[in-house]
């Protein structure tokens, strides 16, 4: 009976602890209705309304509990300048660090260099404001140990674009 009581108390206490604390104070991926409601169908960059790729988007809670959306966008049919410059979007409710670069509250586009598939070169990530001005640039290392790379994912405190990892803090 004593074990049952201790187990019950522990479950009640843990039920009241926010998920972000249980995620070792890291970036916690959010799914379900909260994810569905947070991902926009279109994203605005340089006067263009560009469709988002919900299947290649992630909603995370930061260690402080604020939300950040990372997602790829579909630039097919847009000018070559837009296609070459942008790959995705970031929408943030808080300041955070992306590979050592401070990203503020707001919405941003991002693009990257594309190293050869067999190359171990770093991938360069460029962050732009909605008017197209470059705000930051950083590099991500190739993680060959990644079992199942996808176009965009967040795990273990990193933003992954394919096999290239960019630190999140």
Please give the residue ranges for each predicted region.
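Positively charged n-region of N-terminal signal peptides that target proteins for export
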Residues: 1-4
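Bacterial N-terminal signal peptides
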Residues: 8-16
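General structural signal for secondary-structure boundaries
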Residues: 13, 27-31, 105
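Generic secondary-structure boundary signal with a strong preference for alpha-helix termini
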Residues: 14, 111-112, 143-145
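Residue-level recognition of conserved structural "scaffold" positions that shape functional pockets
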Residues: 17-18, 107
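Residue-level signature of transmembrane alpha-helix interfaces in integral membrane proteins
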Residues: 18-19, 116
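Primarily secretory-pathway and cell-envelope proteins
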Residues: 21-81, 96, 130-169
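Mid-length scaffold segments of soluble, non-membrane domains
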Residues: 75-128
């Amino acid at each position: 009976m004593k074990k049952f009581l201790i187990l019950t108390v522990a479950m009640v206490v843990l039920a009241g602890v926010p998920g972000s604390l249980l995620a070792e104070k890291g970036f916690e991926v959010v799914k379900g209705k909260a994810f569905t409601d947070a991902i926009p169908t279109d994203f605005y960059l340089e006067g263009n309304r560009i469709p988002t790729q919900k299947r290649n988007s992630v909603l995370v809670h930061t260690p402080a509990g604020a939300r950040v959306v990372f997602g790829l966008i579909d630039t097919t049919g847009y000018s070559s300048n837009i296609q070459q410059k942008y790959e995705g979007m970031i929408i943030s409710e808080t300041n955070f660090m992306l590979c050592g670069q401070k990203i503020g509250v707001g919405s941003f586009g991002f693009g990257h260099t594309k190293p050869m598939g067999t190359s171990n070169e770093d991938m360069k990530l460029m962050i732009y404001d909605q008017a197209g001005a470059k705000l930051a640039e950083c590099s991500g290392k190739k993680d060959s140990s990644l079992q199942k790379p996808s176009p965009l994912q967040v795990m273990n405190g990193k933003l992954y674009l394919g096999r290239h990892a960019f630190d999140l803090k």
